[in-house]
Regions:
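N-terminal intrinsically disordered, low-complexity regulatory tails that precede a folded domain
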Residues: 1-6, 34-42, 58, 62, ...
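A structured, charge-rich N-terminal accessory region that forms the first stable segment of a protein
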Residues: 6-50
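Active-site catalytic microenvironments for nucleophilic, acid-base chemistry
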Residues: 26-31, 63, 83, 109
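Active-site-adjacent substructure of cysteine-protease-like catalytic cores
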Residues: 43, 69-125
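Short, solvent-exposed, low-complexity loop/linker segments
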Residues: 46, 50-79
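Noncatalytic regulatory segments and standalone regulatory/sensor domains
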Residues: 47, 109-308
Length: 310
């Protein structure tokens, strides 16, 4: 398997043959499971020449406690209805598009628009109309009939065997937000935000007496976090800290995570420690109490914009 595949977030595939593992990775991420694409590629036995077929993806899905449910329709409208049914249940769906040559993930249907994750795009998340998705999805079965072949629509729903306590809600508005250039870092490091937030927050539950959304929690405590982290670090700005807190709120609300009111003090301490560690990694820290300190990391160079698809 090729080198250069790495774990977190929404980022483009580095080659032409790993779209299948990336599509399954994005489906698992929507179900709250963070799996390295290398693990999926290894389990599926993805090959540089032939890529990954549906049998290999099904094997990988089973290894991560999911089943691929195959649905086939010959009528476009019937195919759309089946796709929408799964998406309304918040079950991510894999489609093989471009005449069965490329895997994508569909996460949501909203007013005949569909939220799609395509690992050859950058940014990966996009919104497609039904005619756009239909034309991309349909497959002419020339293996069956060469002249005037039948048109087929195949989908594979990623059905979890495990109890899903959190599921992502990638609405059209959320995808538009993530596609902004200034939010590229958030998209690329999505897993890191989610992993940390799952330690601080809880999935929504009727057993939580006083659940606080991250928005409400930050309304009460953000000013304290801003002032104390900025004061103690000394070389980080309020705007920079505020941006990280905004990103945390965005990820938290995408999965519907909450903070029990009884755990507010602990959550506040966790966030203060987490933001302080981030500030040190971003800007370094001077020596203190006899330690040598750490140098600030150099500012990353601006990347050139690329036109077209990878």
């Amino acid at each position: 398997m090729a080198e250069g595949l790495f774990g977190p977030g929404f980022y483009p595939q580095p080659n032409e043959w790993t779209c299948g593992p990336f599509a399954l990775k994005h489906a698992l991420l929507a179900l709250g499971r963070m799996v390295d694409v290398n693990q999926i590629s290894s389990t599926a036995r993805t090959h540089w020449w032939s890529g990954t077929n549906e049998i290999q993806l099904a094997r990988a899905a089973r290894a991560f406690e999911c089943d691929l449910v195959l649905e086939r329709r010959a009528d476009a409208e019937q195919a759309r209805k089946v796709l929408v049914k799964y998406l309304r249940e918040q079950t991510p769906v894999l489609l093989c598009v471009d005449e069965w040559s490329h895997w994508i993930t569909v996460l949501r249907a909203e007013d005949r628009r569909f939220v799609v994750v395509d690992s050859t795009d950058d940014p990966l998340l996009s919104v497609r109309t039904w005619p756009q998705l239909r034309n991309w999805w349909r497959y002419h079965d020339t293996d069956y009939v060469k002249d005037n072949p039948p048109v087929l629509y195949d989908l594979m729903a990623v059905a979890p065997r495990f109890r899903t306590t959190v599921k992502a809600d990638f609405s059209v508005d959320r995808v538009k937000f993530l596609r902004r250039p200034e939010n590229r870092r958030l998209a690329h490091h999505w897993n890191e935000y989610l992993e940390d937030l799952l330690e601080i927050c809880k999935p929504p539950s009727v057993r939580i007496a006083e659940p606080l959304s991250m928005g409400e929690f930050l309304r009460r405590h953000q000013e304290l976090l801003l002032t104390r982290v900025v004061y103690w670090h000394g070389d980080i700005s309020r705007d920079e800290v505020g941006r990280v807190l905004r990103d945390m709120r965005f990820v938290s609300e995408t999965y519907g995570l909450v903070i029990p009111a009884s755990m507010s003090r602990r959550a506040l301490a966790d966030l203060a420690i987490l933001i302080s560690i981030w500030a040190c990694s971003q800007r370094g820290v001077d020596g203190m109490f006899g330690s040598p300190g750490a140098d600030a990391r150099p500012e990353p160079k601006a990347s050139r914009k690329r036109n077209g698809r990878r």
